Design a protein with these regions (language model features):
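Active-site phosphate-binding strand-loop segment of PLP-dependent enzymes
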Residues: 26-97
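A short helix->loop->beta-strand "cap" motif at the edges of active sites that frequently abuts
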Residues: 19, 78-82, 108-110
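Structural detector of well-ordered beta-strand residues that form the stable sheet scaffold
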Residues: 1, 22, 84, 113-115
Length: 196
């Protein structure tokens, strides 16, 4: 189950693996808030294995509240599901609302699969280096089998990612401030357009 809209490649990845995606619609009228528990439950069957969220959401930018994350946690517990949480954009939050990682949800620690990427945080578009992080040993072993069946990410991407991870934190703060300034400028300009 995924919220819709969401990152377009989720659907392609799922189809290529033989999985079925069940979308739960969000809407612009309420700012893309998480749909009700009942909307999720309408999609849950005995074949449902996971809920996949992107937090903050791509493409809407919506950041789930603590209450919404607790609702997802409760669904995961109630139906014995996994929660896959793509948190690649967590360093790109420009509001005062707190960011709640799926890893901070008590009671489902063994059911959380966190997805991360260096390309978003370090502006490395096209460098496909990321991480799948879980405390679940069975999921970890299954992922390792898949990883060992493949070769490896391109060497140049690995070198770039390693270098990026050594970047001083001050640089990331400067980049954040620059993006925040650009965001605020764009919002100011859009607000000056009648009807927008």
């Amino acid at each position: 189950i995924i919220t819709d809209p969401s990152y377009a490649n989720y659907m392609a990845f799922a189809v290529s693996c033989g999985a079925v995606i069940k979308p739960v619609k969000t809407n612009i009228e309420n700012g893309f808030k998480l749909p009700s528990v009942e909307e999720f439950e309408k999609q849950i069957t005995d074949k449902t294995r996971a809920i996949l969220i992107c937090n903050p959401n791509n493409p809407t930018g919506y950041l789930y509240t603590k209450q919404e994350m607790m609702q997802i946690r409760d669904l995961v517990k109630k139906y014995n599901l996994y929660l896959s949480s793509d948190e690649a954009y967590r360093a790109s939050i420009y509001t005062k609302r707190p960011y709640i990682s799926a890893f901070h949800l008590e009671g489902i620690e063994d059911h959380v699969i966190l997805i991360d990427s260096v390309s978003k945080r370090y502006s490395l578009c096209g460098v496909r280096i990321g991480a799948l992080i879980t405390k679940n040993k069975e999921v970890h072993q299954a992922v390792m089998k898949f990883c060992q069946a493949r070769l490896s990410p391109p060497l140049i991407g690995q070198v770039i990612a390693e270098s990026a991870l050594a970047t001083p934190h001050e640089y990331l703060e400067e980049v954040y401030d620059e993006y925040l300034s650009r965001r605020n400028f764009l919002i100011d300009q859009l607000n000056q357009i009648p009807g927008v």
